[in-house]
Amino acid sequence: MNVLWLQSAGCGGCTMSLLCAESPNVLDLLAGAGIRFLWHPALSVESGAEVRALLAAIEAGDVALDVLCIEGSIATGPRGTGRYQILSGTGVPMLDWLRRLAPLAGDVVAVGTCATYGGITTAGGNPSEAVGVQ
């Protein structure tokens, strides 16, 4: 099962909690279940051009995307553009990546409170106009 994990606006706490699992070790558990991370920002060694090529291959249909995991809230500001949160190296807002990749995924999983409800990023007047994945 091919899984792409994107981290949007948030602290990465869900990933850190996942990595602290000891019995069983989360990486061994996932591998044993046939789960293959296409990319995870904290677990994968690929970056830059390699990640951009992977995203292009997913969009072209050359790489199957079974599950798209989103960690963190989605910054929609300013004024609905999503430009407050750009996926590094792509020049494309995370909001747009979500819109482009979600229809290609078999399932979309909002990981944690930030991704599901907006989390702490929505506090204090919500200047980034953050929302949950809904």
Language-model region placement:
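Iron-sulfur-associated redox domains of electron-transfer enzymes in respiratory
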Residues: 1-134
